[in-house]
Amino acid sequence: MARPDMGGPKMGGGFGGPRSGGFGGGGGGGGFGGGGFGGGRGGDRGDRGDRDDRGGDEGGGRRGFGRRKVCRFCADKTLKVDYKDQGQMKYFLTERGKIIPRRISGNCAKHQREVATAIKRGRMLAILPYTVGQM
């Protein structure tokens, strides 16, 4: 519903009233460059087509997501999360020293919490870096 003070679709629309010349211009005129920036409701998006008519992959079926990652600590029960093992902990850090998220590392929730705690312990003991120095 159009507000009377803002000039709705019948008045020229847009932001700032019927003759403001601000953003908008109601579906056709005024505003920045004519076409209207957030003006009236009709016509501006008609040439886009429906979502299902936009093209893209026509094959259907499965997308190529690849293999599901398995938590390395659950798969190999002999592996333990150890903050003193710098090589193992560096695997879960980016080049900038940030902890790699679970969806990328493939850890389960339990072991991701353990890894994060171990990395934070290693940082406190100066085994692992908080950040990498800028050049």
UniProtKB/Swiss-Prot annotation:
Q: Where is the composition biased (Gly residues)?
A: 9-41
Family per similarity comment: Belongs to the bacterial ribosomal protein bS18 family.
Give the region (Disordered) as residue ranges.
1-65
Gene that this sequence comes from? rpsR
The GO cellular component terms are: cytosolic small ribosomal subunit
Work out whether the entry's keyword set contains RNA-binding.
yes
Q: How does it assemble?
A: Part of the 30S ribosomal subunit. Forms a tight heterodimer with protein bS6.
Q: Sorted alphabetically, which Pfam families does this protein's record hold?
A: Ribosomal_S18 (PF01084)
So what does this one do? Binds as a heterodimer with protein bS6 to the central domain of the 16S rRNA, where it helps stabilize the platform of the 30S subunit.
The record, for NCBIfam families, names: S18
Any single GO BP term: translation
* Keywords assigned by UniProt, alphabetized: Ribonucleoprotein, Ribosomal protein, RNA-binding, rRNA-binding
Record's compositionally biased regions (Basic and acidic residues): 42-61
Tell me the protein's name. Answer: Small ribosomal subunit protein bS18
One of the record's GO molecular function terms: small ribosomal subunit rRNA binding
